[in-house]
Amino acid sequence: MNQVNAAIAAGTWPVPPVSLFSWGSNNAGQLGLGNTTYYSSPKQIGAASAWLTIAAGYAFVVSTKLDGTLWSWGANGSGQLGIGSTADKSSPNQVGALTAWLKVSAGYAHTLATKTDGTLWSWGWNAYGQLGIGSTVSKSSPNQVGALTTWSAIAAVDRHSLAVKTDGTLWSWGRNHTGQLGLGNTTYYSSPKQVGALTAWLSVAGGRYFSLAIKTDGTLWSWGGNQYGRLGLGNTTGYSSPKQVGALTNWATSSGGIFHTLATKTDGTAWAWGNGTYGSLGQNNTTYYSSPKQVGALTTWLSVTAGGYASSIAIKTDGTLWGWGNNPQGVLGRGNLTDYSSPVQLGALTSWTKAQTGHTFTVAIKT
């Protein structure tokens, strides 16, 4: 147990009240509200607690608390909730009894997580080896990926996985039919394989059949399937090894959906590219773009998340929550089912800190 977790357990750490909200589709209980009713505006999940991180998969959610515990809910047909069964859960269930979980990431139906000791764990669907455990057998409880204690950044991306180690090396495994593993081929791998020899990778992300990564120098890279230009390279050609997106060196975050990509720069601007159907790129149109286009002129964007079904959610530095694009079952949280082709604010609150969008639902943390 680290010092923060120990202080929390002892009651000496000042834990602020943090609330978790959800909205959108709820067929598998992915909203965590104890039912399967969809809601087009935010609904609070239980009482305020010490929620820390959230990760939204296709129809499930995994979340950590400040005390290091791990929780999950929603679809569980492949064991992606990690609770030792395959039954869907419509309210948060604790994953084991450990209090050392640090980071989580959710793919289509598999989950990756790191612990405070730097170990990497996985569970859920494993048909393509996306769990990285050397087999294609699905697991309903956490299994350690190798024996290393140096994992830093992770991304469970649809049907493949990406990770960065503390030495800056990049690793990938799982499905690879479009070259999304970045290994220069289309071979599937059920255990981690290093992507090139560079040691300057910082963060990873991606969408359906493609990958994104940012280096320590602020450059953005992409590879894999490139339908609709979602790689941002100015074309629709697929690549099986990393390609730099433009020449800029100030990218901060990135997020991939099924056919579109979002990113922020260190100057607070937000950018989008790929399939613009339903207005998912925030350009006030439904045009496709194969290279980055700025979303408006604001320089106050903090984070962006590209939803699976052409929706987009973003948080500004003032804590306001915004959305645009496709709005099936109210994934944009506006209380309606209307699509929007440019950013619109979700309510008037100014205390949102994190947001994640699954296929057609959203989960967010508010202080």
Task: Locate the predicted segments by residue.
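Short coil/turn segments that connect the beta-strands within blades of beta-propeller domains
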Residues: 18, 59, 68, 109, ...
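Enriched but not universal
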Residues: 1-23, 366-367
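Surface loop/turn motifs at the tips and blade-to-blade linkers of beta-strand repeat domains
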Residues: 45-47, 95-96, 145-146, 195-196, ...
